């Protein structure tokens, strides 16, 4: 690579760093905010009493009350012990027996997507093409002629199951259907992000004016075999695009200008997204799939504006295309100052670690061509690279104390690859992450233990929605290897639960690892079930361990951050079938209420 090109790549990489824009108060080392317990008689600003405080401490103790001063916990214990922390100004809330847990920590959240869903009008609950036409016509009445009309997908969120069969016509709307509803405007109905449903196809629909603006005619040829431009008997496009993939391409290459999420859109909707997660008791997230530059900047904007209520640990998603075949050692070394552990940031926002994966396909190259726009992804589509090239990157990461995060479902053999690195530079203590585990053999688990790897699950996929696929991949005698959380915990592995934004409640994965129930009400490797207490620990303490924050959060103890949730039901005693339906009555981050339902104290 020419020196000039390489300098451009280094410059672009530097521009993505938080160091270029983190306020001074956020550039302190992560270790600077290690908590220290206050004096036993310190007055509290707030006391929650007469409750069931599930501390998730070492002994999983249960208390009645918790006292908070500033952003930290000063006492946990019986109601009577709170007198020592009560001052004239102390606010006291009677929990009336309600359960309280540490704030939940989502180990792979994709939180930003929840806010982005609010930008475009919903087509949820439509049951006919006429319903769709009525919605589009209503939107057209509020638009000037020629202005774009873009909507969310057809179907009912969060999963968008059984489309188009939910429509009376059992088909997708054509361009003519949409023309009739909005003859003077270009119309585009987006496809789903495939991981919401975990099954293709992804289908989007456009009217005649939208096709014209996209330059799509009867002669247009799809750039990849997985994307079909549906055409009628006369050879003209019908306006329907069908993708046998999980990440939409049509909207990126043909309708990008109409569908792109701007930096302001991302920053503006992050608070909406955070509130949706807070509604189920989540107070911290880890974005293990990585954040591209546009998403990093959006988080920084929200942080500067004081609207980022969620504690957010981000991972960098690189754009490798510009690097070409140049040696990557100097680049990784240059990143060490802001991606290493501990890195810049604070308890509210930090970026540490590098998301890595093996290879990418032709469709990913096309998606990457839209950089810096990343659509629903929020990560760079060309983060994958050949195995030997990736090994080079991993060795440089290990040498520079940069943590690597890889998703097992898109990085085949990642544990073996990490082991090759471990033979040269020991990984123990570095907490490298294997995400989206689907199945693990006993030998895999032995390697994980030896290297001290941290794991994040994806139970919404591999237990709930795709267990049939997992069973087909493995012989019956190996079905116990499907998301083997029981075996992992017994081996001492730290496992963090995740939502992947499908949907946002952490009580779904909590229920899934306890019940091992799939969408068809079938048990999946039931011998791998764990207890409710263990599931809560995976969703709290282990999530804190994932981000090197176990001394600051993850349990309710004096000196720790006052991140907690008052729940609608007791996760330790509610009927198992109702465990997944638990929500938060009140959620608190750093001693401040960030979410509460109306009259929850009544």
Model-inferred region functions:
Residues 1-16:
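N-terminal secretory signal peptides and thylakoid transit peptides that target proteins
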Residues 394-407, 412-432, 436-438, 442-446, ...:
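His/Asp/Glu-enriched, well-ordered alpha-helical/loop segment
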Residues 38-49, 54, 58-336, 343, ...:
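Divalent metal-binding segments
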Residues 18-23:
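Hydrophobic h-region of N-terminal signal peptides that target proteins for export
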Residues 214, 322-325, 465-469, 507-508, ...:
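Short, charged, surface-exposed secondary-structure boundary motifs
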Residues 24-28:
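Boundary at the C-terminal end of the N-terminal hydrophobic targeting segment
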């Amino acid at each position: 690579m020419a020196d000039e090109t390489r300098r451009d790549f280094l410059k672009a990489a530097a521009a993505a760093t938080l160091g270029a824009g983190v306020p001074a108060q956020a550039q302190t080392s992560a270790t600077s905010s290690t908590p220290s317990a206050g004096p036993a008689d310190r007055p509290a600003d707030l006391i929650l009493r007469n409750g069931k405080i599930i501390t998730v401490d070492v002994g999983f103790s249960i208390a009645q009350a918790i006292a908070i001063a500033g952003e930290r916990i000063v006492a946990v214990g019986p109601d009577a012990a709170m007198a020592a922390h009560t001052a004239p100004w102390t606010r006291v809330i009677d929990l009336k027996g309600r359960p309280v847990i540490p704030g939940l920590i989502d180990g792979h959240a994709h939180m930003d997507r929840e806010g982005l869903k609010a930008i475009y009008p919903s087509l949820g609950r439509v049951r006919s093409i006429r319903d769709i036409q009525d919605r589009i016509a209503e939107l057209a009445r509020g638009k000037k002629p020629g202005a774009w009309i873009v909507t969310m997908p057809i179907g009912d969120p969060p999963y968008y199951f059984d489309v188009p069969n939910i429509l009376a016509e059992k088909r997708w709307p054509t361009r003519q259907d949409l023309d009739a509803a909005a003859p003077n405007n270009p119309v585009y109905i987006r496809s789903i992000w495939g991981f919401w449903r975990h099954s293709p196809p992804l289908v989007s629909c456009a009217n005649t004016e939208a096709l014209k603006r996209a330059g799509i005619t009867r002669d247009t040829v799809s750039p990849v075999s997985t994307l079909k431009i549906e055409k009628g008997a006369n050879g003209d496009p019908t306006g329907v695009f069908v993708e046998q993939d999980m990440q939409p391409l049509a909207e990126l290459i043909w309708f990008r200008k109409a569908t792109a999420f701007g930096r302001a859109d991302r920053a503006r909707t992050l608070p909406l997204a955070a509130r949706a997660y807070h509604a189920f008791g989540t107070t911290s997230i880890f974005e293990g799939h990585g954040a591209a530059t546009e998403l990093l900047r959006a988080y920084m904007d929200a942080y500067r504006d004081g609207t980022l209520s969620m504690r957010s640990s981000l991972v960098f998603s690189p754009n490798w295309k510009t690097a070409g075949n140049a040696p990557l050692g100097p680049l990784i070394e240059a990143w060490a100052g802001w991606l290493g552990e501990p890195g810049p940031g604070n308890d509210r926002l930090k970026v540490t670690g590098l998301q890595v994966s093996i290879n990418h396909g032709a469709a990913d190259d096309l998606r990457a061509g839209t950089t810096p726009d990343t659509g629903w992804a929020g990560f760079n589509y060309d983060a994958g690279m050949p195995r030997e090239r990736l090994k080079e990157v991993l060795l440089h990461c290990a040498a520079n104390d940069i943590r690597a995060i890889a998703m097992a479902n898109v990085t085949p053999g990642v544990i073996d690859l990490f082991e090759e690195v471990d033979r040269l530079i020991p990984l123990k203590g570095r907490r490298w992450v294997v995400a989206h585990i689907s199945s693990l053999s006993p030998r895999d688990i032995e390697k994980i233990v030896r290297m001290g790897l941290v794991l994040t699950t994806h139970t919404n996929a591999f237990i709930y929605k795709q267990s049939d696929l997992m069973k087909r991949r493995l012989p019956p005698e190996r079905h116990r290897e499907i998301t083997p959380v029981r075996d992992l915990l017994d081996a001492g592995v730290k496992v963090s639960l995740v939502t992947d934004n499908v949907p946002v409640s952490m009580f779904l994965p909590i229920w899934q690892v306890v019940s091992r129930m799939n969408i068809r009400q079938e048990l999946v490797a039931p011998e791998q079930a764990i207890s409710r207490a263990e599931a809560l620990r995976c969703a709290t303490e282990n999530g804190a361990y994932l981000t090197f924050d176990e001394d600051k959060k993850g349990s309710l103890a004096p000196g720790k951050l006052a991140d907690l949730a008052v729940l609608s039901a007791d996760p330790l005693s509610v009927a198992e079938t109702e465990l997944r339906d638990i929500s938060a009555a009140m959620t608190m981050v750093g001693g401040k209420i960030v979410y509460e339902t109306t009259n929850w104290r009544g």
